[in-house]
């Protein structure tokens, strides 16, 4: 870290272990940042802080009216994904839960081929752009982007860029729980109009952006009734919004992948090179 800060010409201080010294260091760093009008770093070595008292998690700032959980939505979508299809999933709990479902299915012998998914861990808002690139490069392969409402808001320009390309082989699935669930449960900036169905904001955005086929579902029955898979005669990209609820109990048990991100990338590249689209 220190060599990187030095290379970037960023001033830094190392925080001492005593409380008074730590406070003084932060005051010095703040004063220097104001004086130079530049960022200043304060480095705290591992183990410098004592353990904090455990506090109860904050209550989520979202309603729980939707009957569909994220897992139920992912299970339903995966049932429609073909073996030669490619899936790009957004960061946070969505990718972790998708990974867990795939591992469970593979253990039972019913999972998809290894490398058929790319988990965008730590890359909030970039899943759609990656899916767009794959769909353009391999037009005969169906590509699924499993996105989140907070992630889509992060890089909303990709919505218009994707819609404008009119790719019939791209299915953009948005899981909308109205919050940034993976990072604390804060409500997203998307407005909610009590006079309209929950979730219509993003569906209207997709229509305005130019998606040819726009659908929404708030429960499993609605999702099952939708015929949103395009055929060779259809033109334009598909947008599907699924309203989900937050399930804190599920989040506590979500596994973290054993593989590295490089391993996921290599597996995805191998899949895309060798697995023929049908």
Features from the language model and the residues they span:
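Phosphate/diphosphate-binding glycine-rich loops and adjacent basic-rich segments that engage nucleotide
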Residues: 25-79, 83, 245, 249-278
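Residue-level detector of anion-binding/catalytic polar loops
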Residues: 11, 39, 86, 212-213
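Active-site glycine- and acidic-residue-rich loops that bind
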Residues: 16-26, 68, 150-155, 219-221
């Amino acid at each position: 870290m220190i060599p990187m800060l030095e290379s970037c010409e960023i001033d830094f201080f190392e925080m001492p272990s005593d409380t008074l010294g730590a406070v003084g260091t932060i005051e010095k760093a703040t004063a220097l940042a104001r004086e130079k009008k530049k960022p200043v770093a304060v480095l705290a070595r591992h183990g410098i802080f004592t353990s904090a008292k455990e506090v109860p998690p904050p209550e989520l700032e979202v309603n729980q009216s939707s009957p569909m959980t994220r897992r139920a939505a992912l299970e339903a979508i995966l049932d429609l994904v073909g073996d030669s299809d490619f899936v790009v999933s957004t960061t946070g709990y969505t990718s972790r839960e998708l990974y867990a479902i795939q591992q469970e299915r593979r253990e039972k012998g019913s999972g998809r081929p290894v490398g058929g998914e790319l988990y965008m861990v730590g890359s909030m808002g970039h899943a759609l752009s990656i899916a767009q690139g794959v769909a353009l490069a391999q037009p005969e392969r169906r590509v699924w982007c499993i996105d989140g409402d907070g992630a889509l808001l992060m890089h909303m320009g990709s919505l218009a860029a994707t819609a404008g390309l009119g790719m019939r082989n791209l299915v953009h699935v948005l899981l909308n729980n109205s919050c940034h669930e993976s990072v604390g449960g804060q409500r997203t900036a998307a407005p909610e109009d009590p006079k309209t169905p929950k979730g219509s904001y993003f569906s209207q955005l997709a229509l305005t952006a130019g998606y040819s086929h726009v659908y929404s579902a708030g429960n499993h029955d609605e999702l099952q009734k939708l015929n949103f898979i395009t055929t060779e005669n259809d033109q334009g990209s598909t947008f599907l919004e699924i309203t989900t609820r937050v399930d804190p109990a599920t989040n506590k048990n979500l596994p973290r992948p054993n593989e590295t991100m490089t391993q996921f990338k290599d597996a995805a590249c191998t899949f895309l090179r060798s697995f023929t689209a049908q």
